[in-house]
Amino acid sequence: MEAERRPGPVRRRRRSGLAGRFANRLVRAAVLVAIVPLVLTLIYCLPFVHPVSTLMLADLATLRGYERQWTPLEEAGRNVIHSVMMSEDGQFCSHRGIDLGELKAAINEALSGERTRGASTIPMQTVKNLYLWPGRSFLRKAIEAPLAIYLDAVMPKHRIMEIYLNIAEWGPGIYGVEAAAQHYFGRPSRDLSRREAALLAVTLPNPSERNPAQPSAALRRLASVVEARAQRAGGYVGCLGST
Protein backbone atom coordinates (compact mmCIF):
# COMPACT_ATOMS: atom_id res chain seq x y z
CA MET A 1 0.00 0.00 0.00
CA GLU A 2 1.44 3.26 -1.10
CA ALA A 3 2.02 5.96 1.48
CA GLU A 4 -0.35 8.91 1.21
CA ARG A 5 1.21 11.73 -0.74
CA ARG A 6 1.52 15.03 1.01
CA PRO A 7 1.68 18.37 -0.76
CA GLY A 8 5.26 19.24 -1.39
CA PRO A 9 6.89 22.47 -0.33
CA VAL A 10 6.53 23.92 -3.84
CA ARG A 11 2.75 23.43 -3.84
CA ARG A 12 2.43 24.87 -0.34
CA ARG A 13 4.45 27.91 -1.33
CA ARG A 14 2.26 28.36 -4.42
CA ARG A 15 -0.93 28.30 -2.35
CA SER A 16 0.60 30.65 0.18
CA GLY A 17 1.62 33.02 -2.60
CA LEU A 18 -1.89 33.05 -4.10
CA ALA A 19 -3.44 33.74 -0.69
CA GLY A 20 -0.95 36.52 -0.06
CA ARG A 21 -1.67 38.19 -3.40
CA PHE A 22 -5.42 37.95 -2.81
CA ALA A 23 -5.09 39.50 0.65
CA ASN A 24 -2.87 42.25 -0.75
CA ARG A 25 -5.42 43.09 -3.44
CA LEU A 26 -8.21 43.06 -0.88
CA VAL A 27 -6.33 45.52 1.32
CA ARG A 28 -5.62 47.78 -1.66
CA ALA A 29 -9.30 47.74 -2.64
CA ALA A 30 -10.34 48.60 0.92
CA VAL A 31 -7.87 51.50 1.04
CA LEU A 32 -9.16 52.78 -2.30
CA VAL A 33 -12.78 52.62 -1.13
CA ALA A 34 -11.81 54.51 2.04
CA ILE A 35 -9.92 57.20 0.12
CA VAL A 36 -12.67 57.96 -2.42
CA PRO A 37 -15.04 59.79 -0.01
CA LEU A 38 -12.12 61.68 1.54
CA VAL A 39 -11.07 63.01 -1.87
CA LEU A 40 -14.64 63.69 -3.01
CA THR A 41 -15.32 65.66 0.16
CA LEU A 42 -12.46 68.02 -0.68
CA ILE A 43 -13.84 68.44 -4.20
CA TYR A 44 -17.33 69.10 -2.83
CA CYS A 45 -15.95 72.03 -0.84
CA LEU A 46 -15.80 73.95 -4.12
CA PRO A 47 -18.94 76.11 -4.40
CA PHE A 48 -19.48 75.45 -8.12
CA VAL A 49 -19.64 71.65 -7.63
CA HIS A 50 -23.16 70.26 -7.26
CA PRO A 51 -22.93 66.79 -5.67
CA VAL A 52 -25.53 64.06 -6.13
CA SER A 53 -26.56 61.42 -3.62
CA THR A 54 -26.32 57.65 -3.90
CA LEU A 55 -30.13 57.51 -4.16
CA MET A 56 -30.05 59.95 -7.07
CA LEU A 57 -27.45 57.79 -8.80
CA ALA A 58 -29.65 54.74 -8.20
CA ASP A 59 -32.61 56.55 -9.78
CA LEU A 60 -30.48 57.32 -12.83
CA ALA A 61 -29.18 53.75 -13.04
CA THR A 62 -32.73 52.38 -13.02
CA LEU A 63 -33.88 54.98 -15.58
CA ARG A 64 -36.40 56.51 -13.17
CA GLY A 65 -34.81 59.95 -13.16
CA TYR A 66 -35.36 62.56 -10.47
CA GLU A 67 -36.33 66.18 -9.75
CA ARG A 68 -33.61 68.45 -8.36
CA GLN A 69 -32.94 72.16 -8.79
CA TRP A 70 -29.70 73.21 -7.14
CA THR A 71 -30.26 76.25 -4.93
CA PRO A 72 -27.51 78.26 -3.19
CA LEU A 73 -28.04 78.44 0.55
CA GLU A 74 -28.68 82.19 0.55
CA GLU A 75 -31.56 81.63 -1.91
CA ALA A 76 -33.16 78.70 -0.09
CA GLY A 77 -35.09 80.89 2.31
CA ARG A 78 -34.61 81.58 6.00
CA ASN A 79 -37.82 79.80 7.02
CA VAL A 80 -36.72 76.52 5.44
CA ILE A 81 -33.15 76.70 6.71
CA HIS A 82 -34.17 77.42 10.29
CA SER A 83 -36.94 74.81 10.26
CA VAL A 84 -34.72 72.05 8.90
CA MET A 85 -31.94 72.85 11.32
CA MET A 86 -34.20 72.96 14.38
CA SER A 87 -35.96 69.78 13.30
CA GLU A 88 -32.93 67.71 12.31
CA ASP A 89 -29.94 69.06 14.26
CA GLY A 90 -30.45 71.94 16.66
CA GLN A 91 -26.79 71.81 17.77
CA PHE A 92 -25.46 71.94 14.20
CA CYS A 93 -23.41 75.09 14.79
CA SER A 94 -21.85 73.92 18.04
CA HIS A 95 -20.83 70.28 17.46
CA ARG A 96 -18.00 68.94 15.30
CA GLY A 97 -19.84 66.47 13.11
CA ILE A 98 -21.45 64.31 15.77
CA ASP A 99 -23.56 65.27 18.76
CA LEU A 100 -21.94 63.34 21.60
CA GLY A 101 -24.83 63.94 24.00
CA GLU A 102 -27.43 62.56 21.61
CA LEU A 103 -25.14 59.71 20.57
CA LYS A 104 -24.54 58.67 24.18
CA ALA A 105 -28.28 58.73 24.90
CA ALA A 106 -29.00 56.62 21.81
CA ILE A 107 -26.35 54.05 22.79
CA ASN A 108 -27.71 53.82 26.33
CA GLU A 109 -31.22 53.26 24.99
CA ALA A 110 -29.98 50.55 22.62
CA LEU A 111 -28.10 48.76 25.41
CA SER A 112 -31.15 48.86 27.65
CA GLY A 113 -33.35 47.41 24.93
CA GLU A 114 -35.40 50.55 24.43
CA ARG A 115 -36.37 51.94 21.07
CA THR A 116 -33.47 54.18 20.09
CA ARG A 117 -33.85 57.85 19.28
CA GLY A 118 -32.38 59.39 16.16
CA ALA A 119 -28.84 60.60 16.87
CA SER A 120 -27.85 61.54 13.32
CA THR A 121 -26.56 65.07 12.83
CA ILE A 122 -26.79 66.97 9.57
CA PRO A 123 -23.12 66.13 8.75
CA MET A 124 -23.88 62.45 9.41
CA GLN A 125 -26.94 62.55 7.18
CA THR A 126 -24.97 64.39 4.51
CA VAL A 127 -22.19 61.77 4.30
CA LYS A 128 -24.81 59.01 4.38
CA ASN A 129 -26.63 60.60 1.43
CA LEU A 130 -23.39 61.23 -0.46
CA TYR A 131 -21.50 57.98 0.06
CA LEU A 132 -23.45 55.30 1.93
CA TRP A 133 -26.64 53.27 1.74
CA PRO A 134 -30.10 53.81 3.30
CA GLY A 135 -31.44 51.79 6.20
CA ARG A 136 -30.21 51.40 9.75
CA SER A 137 -27.19 49.31 10.67
CA PHE A 138 -24.32 49.53 13.13
CA LEU A 139 -21.86 49.06 10.24
CA ARG A 140 -23.17 52.10 8.44
CA LYS A 141 -23.08 54.17 11.63
CA ALA A 142 -19.50 53.04 12.29
CA ILE A 143 -18.51 54.36 8.85
CA GLU A 144 -20.75 57.41 9.01
CA ALA A 145 -19.42 58.90 12.25
CA PRO A 146 -15.73 59.36 11.26
CA LEU A 147 -16.75 60.60 7.81
CA ALA A 148 -19.02 63.18 9.46
CA ILE A 149 -16.20 64.37 11.71
CA TYR A 150 -13.91 64.67 8.67
CA LEU A 151 -16.60 66.51 6.68
CA ASP A 152 -17.11 69.01 9.50
CA ALA A 153 -13.36 69.52 9.83
CA VAL A 154 -12.67 70.35 6.17
CA MET A 155 -15.93 71.92 4.98
CA PRO A 156 -17.54 75.18 6.17
CA LYS A 157 -20.84 74.79 7.99
CA HIS A 158 -22.79 76.82 5.45
CA ARG A 159 -21.53 74.57 2.64
CA ILE A 160 -22.54 71.43 4.56
CA MET A 161 -26.03 72.83 5.02
CA GLU A 162 -26.20 73.87 1.36
CA ILE A 163 -25.27 70.38 0.16
CA TYR A 164 -27.64 68.71 2.61
CA LEU A 165 -30.60 70.84 1.53
CA ASN A 166 -29.87 70.04 -2.12
CA ILE A 167 -29.49 66.25 -1.84
CA ALA A 168 -32.01 65.35 0.89
CA GLU A 169 -34.87 63.17 -0.34
CA TRP A 170 -38.35 64.66 0.02
CA GLY A 171 -40.29 61.89 -1.66
CA PRO A 172 -39.79 59.37 -4.49
CA GLY A 173 -37.59 61.05 -7.08
CA ILE A 174 -37.75 64.45 -5.32
CA TYR A 175 -34.40 65.74 -4.09
CA GLY A 176 -33.48 69.09 -2.65
CA VAL A 177 -35.53 71.76 -0.96
CA GLU A 178 -36.31 73.70 -4.15
CA ALA A 179 -37.79 70.69 -5.96
CA ALA A 180 -39.73 69.81 -2.80
CA ALA A 181 -41.15 73.33 -2.41
CA GLN A 182 -42.23 73.41 -6.05
CA HIS A 183 -43.67 69.89 -5.95
CA TYR A 184 -45.70 70.21 -2.74
CA PHE A 185 -46.53 73.93 -2.56
CA GLY A 186 -46.01 75.24 -6.10
CA ARG A 187 -43.64 78.04 -5.13
CA PRO A 188 -39.89 78.63 -4.59
CA SER A 189 -38.46 77.57 -1.26
CA ARG A 190 -37.56 81.17 -0.37
CA ASP A 191 -41.27 82.08 -0.55
CA LEU A 192 -42.54 79.35 1.78
CA SER A 193 -44.35 80.43 4.91
CA ARG A 194 -43.09 79.37 8.32
CA ARG A 195 -45.81 76.72 8.46
CA GLU A 196 -44.97 75.29 5.04
CA ALA A 197 -41.26 75.26 5.85
CA ALA A 198 -41.93 73.41 9.11
CA LEU A 199 -44.07 70.84 7.29
CA LEU A 200 -41.25 70.22 4.81
CA ALA A 201 -38.74 69.87 7.64
CA VAL A 202 -40.70 67.27 9.59
CA THR A 203 -41.14 65.21 6.42
CA LEU A 204 -37.40 64.50 6.18
CA PRO A 205 -37.07 61.52 8.54
CA ASN A 206 -39.59 59.50 6.51
CA PRO A 207 -40.34 61.17 3.16
CA SER A 208 -41.85 58.04 1.62
CA GLU A 209 -44.70 58.02 4.16
CA ARG A 210 -45.13 61.72 5.00
CA ASN A 211 -46.73 64.26 2.70
CA PRO A 212 -46.27 67.91 3.72
CA ALA A 213 -49.07 69.01 1.39
CA GLN A 214 -51.52 66.55 2.99
CA PRO A 215 -50.24 66.24 6.56
CA SER A 216 -51.76 63.96 9.16
CA ALA A 217 -52.83 65.35 12.52
CA ALA A 218 -49.63 64.01 14.09
CA LEU A 219 -47.50 65.64 11.40
CA ARG A 220 -49.28 68.97 11.92
CA ARG A 221 -48.60 68.81 15.66
CA LEU A 222 -44.93 68.06 15.02
CA ALA A 223 -44.74 70.92 12.52
CA SER A 224 -46.15 73.29 15.14
CA VAL A 225 -43.34 72.38 17.53
CA VAL A 226 -40.69 72.88 14.84
CA GLU A 227 -42.25 76.16 13.71
CA ALA A 228 -42.04 77.50 17.26
CA ARG A 229 -38.43 76.40 17.59
CA ALA A 230 -37.52 77.96 14.23
CA GLN A 231 -38.91 81.32 15.35
CA ARG A 232 -36.48 81.24 18.29
CA ALA A 233 -33.53 79.88 16.31
CA GLY A 234 -31.46 83.07 16.33
CA GLY A 235 -28.94 81.84 18.90
CA TYR A 236 -28.45 78.52 17.14
CA VAL A 237 -27.87 79.51 13.51
CA GLY A 238 -24.93 81.90 13.84
CA CYS A 239 -22.58 79.67 11.83
CA LEU A 240 -24.79 80.14 8.76
CA GLY A 241 -24.24 83.88 8.55
CA SER A 242 -27.18 86.07 7.58
CA THR A 243 -29.39 83.27 6.23
From Swiss-Prot:
GO terms for cellular component: peptidoglycan-based cell wall; plasma membrane. It is found in: Cell inner membrane. Pathway: Cell wall biogenesis; peptidoglycan biosynthesis. The chain crosses the membrane at residues 29-49. GO terms for molecular function: pentosyltransferase activity; peptidoglycan glycosyltransferase activity. It is a single-pass membrane protein. It catalyses: [GlcNAc-(1->4)-Mur2Ac(oyl-L-Ala-gamma-D-Glu-L-Lys-D-Ala-D-Ala)](n)-di-trans,octa-cis-undecaprenyl diphosphate + beta-D-GlcNAc-(1->4)-Mur2Ac(oyl-L-Ala-gamma-D-Glu-L-Lys-D-Ala-D-Ala)-di-trans,octa-cis-undecaprenyl diphosphate = [GlcNAc-(1->4)-Mur2Ac(oyl-L-Ala-gamma-D-Glu-L-Lys-D-Ala-D-Ala)](n+1)-di-trans,octa-cis-undecaprenyl diphosphate + di-trans,octa-cis-undecaprenyl diphosphate + H(+). Keywords: Cell inner membrane, Cell membrane, Cell shape, Cell wall biogenesis/degradation, Glycosyltransferase, Membrane, Peptidoglycan synthesis, Transferase, Transmembrane, Transmembrane helix. The keyword RNA-binding does not apply. Its EC number is 2.4.99.28. One of its GO terms (biological process) is peptidoglycan biosynthetic process. Gene3D superfamilies: Biosynthetic peptidoglycan transglycosylase-like. Peptidoglycan polymerase that catalyzes glycan chain elongation from lipid-linked precursors. Belongs to the glycosyltransferase 51 family. This is Biosynthetic peptidoglycan transglycosylase. It comes from Chelativorans sp. (strain BNC1). The lineage of its organism: Bacteria, Pseudomonadati, Pseudomonadota, Alphaproteobacteria, Hyphomicrobiales.
